[in-house]
């Protein structure tokens, strides 16, 4: 199996992306196709010993930066690493694609060159979030669709359900709607209409609304929302986590006794940090497009890239997209 990697995508590319690819081929049977500036990639690779039959390079001289407008950049930079990686997938020269680059550009490229799974109204960007249980939850959408209809959210629920069933082996995953209150009837018109749609569809194990404070408790396996709400929720959670660790670090260093206590608790802090570490998951799929595309965090280092590549392999093997297509037949008012 071949997985294309946008080697120039992310804050630490191309060094960390390349290192992640080298780690991935040690722990899996995939071949990684590095898409990026060949000269730079060759300079990095010469310092490592690896199975040269399982690392390939496709030259891409352009890079879509994080600040660039996604749709414009995709059209203007056809020789960019993101676009070329997606094109390889379209041409079936690879089985999946991974990028830690400009999320909007990955989304735009995938829609332009791969299209949607037949019947999917809107694809969704998902992310895995750590919980108090042993299994993460998936939340979608987190930014692809800021304006949604109830039918879009119903399809997000379906795609999240199938993903958690297949990837995490959760039978009949619990599905919830992210809302401003737990009670039925809460929220705006979209939330209320979506609630009724999910509640009355027998294929869903719908448990009702969850509030933002409950996101990380593991109450639901799949959390559904529009991209506007989802993006704010995730970015807020990231900010709170970073600030909390900074405050703890500052307090631990404030006196001798707190420093000693901090040293004693260091293993516990490491366990907590590992549970919150996005690199453990690697990335999350762009669900609903006609191909396996994994989006990694922009700050991904080698470990996250390695895990994203391994996740892409797993998603391909599990035929998630085929199962989504089959699942659509169980939703009324499909439309194309």
From Swiss-Prot:
User: Quaternary form?
Assistant: Homodimer. Probably interacts with PlsY.
Q: What is this protein called?
A: Phosphate acyltransferase
Q: Which pathway does the UniProt entry assign to this protein? A: Lipid metabolism; phospholipid metabolism
One GO CC annotation: cytoplasm
Q: Per the UniProt entry, what are the Gene Ontology biological process annotations, in alphabetical order?
A: fatty acid biosynthetic process; phospholipid biosynthetic process
Reaction(s) catalysed by this chain's protein? a fatty acyl-[ACP] + phosphate = an acyl phosphate + holo-[ACP]
Q: Which InterPro entries match?
A: FA_synthesis (IPR003664), Phospholipid_synth_PlsX-like (IPR012281)
Domain of life assignment: Bacteria
**UniProt source species:** Dictyoglomus thermophilum (strain ATCC 35947 / DSM 3960 / H-6-12)
- Family matches, as PANTHER family: FATTY ACID/PHOSPHOLIPID SYNTHESIS PROTEIN PLSX, PHOSPHATE ACYLTRANSFERASE
SUPFAM superfamilies tied to this protein = Isocitrate/Isopropylmalate dehydrogenase-like (SSF53659)
Pfam annotation, one family? FA_synthesis
* Function, as annotated: Catalyzes the reversible formation of acyl-phosphate (acyl-PO(4)) from acyl-[acyl-carrier-protein] (acyl-ACP). This enzyme utilizes acyl-ACP as fatty acyl donor, but not acyl-CoA.
Top-tier EC class:
transferase
């Amino acid at each position: 199996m071949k997985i294309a990697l946008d080697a120039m995508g992310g804050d630490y590319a191309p060094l960390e992306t390349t290192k992640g690819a080298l780690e991935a081929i040690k722990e899996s049977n995939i071949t990684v196709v590095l898409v990026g500036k060949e000269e730079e990639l060759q300079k990095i690779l010469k310092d490592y010993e690896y199975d040269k039959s399982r690392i390939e390079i496709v030259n891409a001289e352009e890079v879509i930066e994080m600040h660039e407008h996604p749709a414009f950049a995709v059209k203007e930079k056809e020789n960019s690493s993101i676009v070329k990686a997606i094109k390889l997938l379209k041409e079936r020269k690879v089985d999946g694609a991974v990028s830690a680059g400009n999320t909007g550009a990955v989304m735009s490229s995938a829609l332009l060159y791969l299209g949607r799974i037949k019947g999917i109204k809107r694809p969704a960007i998902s992310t895995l979030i750590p919980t108090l249980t042993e299994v993460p939850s998936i939340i979608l959408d987190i930014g692809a669709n800021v304006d949604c209809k109830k039918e879009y959210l119903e399809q997000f629920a379906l795609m999240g359900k199938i993903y958690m069933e297949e990837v995490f082996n959760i039978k009949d995953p619990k599905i919830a709607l992210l809302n401003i209150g737990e009670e039925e009837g809460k929220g705006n018109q979209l939330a209320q209409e979506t609630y009724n749609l999910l509640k009355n569809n027998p294929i869903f194990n719908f448990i009702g609304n969850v509030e933002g404070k409950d996101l990380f408790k593991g109450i639901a396996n799949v959390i559904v929302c529009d991209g506007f709400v989802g993006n704010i929720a995730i970015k807020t959670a990231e900010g709170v986590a970073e600030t909390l660790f900074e405050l703890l670090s500052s307090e631990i260093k404030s006196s001798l006794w707190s420093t000693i206590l901090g040293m004693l608790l260091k293993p516990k802090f490491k366990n907590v940090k590992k549970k919150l570490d996005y690199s453990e998951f690697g990335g999350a799929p762009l669900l609903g497009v006609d191909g396996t595309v994994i989006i990694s965090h922009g700050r991904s280092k080698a470990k996250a890239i390695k895990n994203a590549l391994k996740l892409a392999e797993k998603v391909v093997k599990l035929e998630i997209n085929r199962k989504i297509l089959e699942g659509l037949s169980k939703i009324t008012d499909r439309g194309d």
